[in-house]
Amino acid sequence: MQPDIAPNPHSTRPGLSRRFSVAPMMDWTDHHCRYFMRLLSSQALLYTEMVTTGALLHGDRERFLRHDETEHPLALQLGGSTAAGLAACARLAEAAGYDEVNLNVGCPSDRVQNNMIGACLMAHPQLVADCVKAMRDAVGIPVTVKHRIGINGRDSYAELCDFVGTVHDAGCQSFTVHARIAILEGLSPKENRDIPPLRYDVVAQLKTDFPELEIVLNGGIKTLEQCSEHLQTFDGVMLGREAYHNPYLLAQVDQQLFGSVAPVISRHAALESMRPYIAAHIASGGNMHHVTRHMLGLGLGFPGARRFRQLLSVDIHKAENPLLLLDQAAKFLEGH
């Protein structure tokens, strides 16, 4: 089932599909990262870093909403828990051209918990439902939710069903489920991505019990072969850290998961395709490392990978002409 996906008939953008997506990741999925990832896959749904309602309503709005037209299909992830604030931000997202707005109900960080953002909201399903309804009433683009299978103290399957059912009653049709509970005290966000065990079986049961909903699986997925297996059960898969650290995995997403017959871009061609973008960023006063830090994984597993990473990170800061370093790094990928 693919609810809420019809593209604007007057748009040349690819239609929004959640069959494969790259997770919102703080400090990682900025607009430079997304531009690079889009070069590798035309079909993957990309997400922004989480933006809080306070930051968007009272901060540098242009910076938080900035994106390139090539990044579509593109979703804005919001963090917040007030219906009015989330509705206002959803309107801003729609006006800025985003294809979807997603509510974060999965982040376990202490910093966001203190502001009633993220996974702690799983303890308040009706509040989440009220927020979703307000957002849906405010915009015409899809409103989705990303959440865990539970939190400590509220981690039974019955409570998960209560959460999903309540939020579904508010109109949400698509749920991206990180197949771990979140432990809200005593673990860092990084530990919360590793220590709680993965429970794909729980998410599969959720899909069985809510067949009318779009259920996207997130957590621990590392290969496109695993994606294909999970897509026999779930409507979509979302990759996080693996897609960032090994970005060339995205180069075969269109062919393996969407049936594209287009040729797969080479690692070398991907890096070369970024050169004009990087040159423009430098010309506008930016630092090349803002962009190339997201590209270090292109050399993963290659002889000289360490030198490749060094050229695009450490050496940049002392280079008079950083584009020469980019060209040196490209030589490591020639023929690949």
From Swiss-Prot:
Catalytic activity entry: 5,6-dihydrouridine(20) in tRNA + NADP(+) = uridine(20) in tRNA + NADPH + H(+); 5,6-dihydrouridine(20) in tRNA + NAD(+) = uridine(20) in tRNA + NADH + H(+); 5,6-dihydrouridine(20a) in tRNA + NADP(+) = uridine(20a) in tRNA + NADPH + H(+); 5,6-dihydrouridine(20a) in tRNA + NAD(+) = uridine(20a) in tRNA + NADH + H(+)
Recorded GO MF terms: flavin adenine dinucleotide binding; FMN binding; tRNA binding; tRNA-dihydrouridine20 synthase activity; tRNA-dihydrouridine20a synthase activity
Enzyme class: oxidoreductase
Gene3D superfamilies: 1.20.120.1460, Aldolase class I
Site location (Interacts with tRNA): 104, 190, 193, 306, 309
A UniProt-annotated Pfam family: Dus
InterPro entries: Aldolase_TIM, DUS-like_FMN-bd, DUS_fam, DusA, tRNA_hU_synthase_CS
Residues in the signal sequence: none
Keyword annotations from UniProtKB, A to Z: Flavoprotein, FMN, NADP, Oxidoreductase, RNA-binding, tRNA processing, tRNA-binding
Active site per UniProt: 107 (proton donor)
CDD domains: DUS_like_FMN
EC number from the UniProt entry: 1.3.1.-, 1.3.1.91
Cofactors: FMN
Positions contributing to FMN binding: 24-26, 77, 146, 178, 218-220, 240-241
Domain of life: Bacteria
The protein's role, per its UniProt record: Catalyzes the synthesis of 5,6-dihydrouridine (D), a modified base found in the D-loop of most tRNAs, via the reduction of the C5-C6 double bond in target uridines. Specifically modifies U20 and U20a in tRNAs.
Family: Belongs to the Dus family. DusA subfamily.
PANTHER family in UniProt: FMN-LINKED OXIDOREDUCTASES SUPERFAMILY PROTEIN
NCBIfam families reported for this sequence: PRK11815.1, yjbN
HAMAP family: DusA_subfam
The protein's name in its UniProt record: tRNA-dihydrouridine(20/20a) synthase
Encoding gene per record: dusA
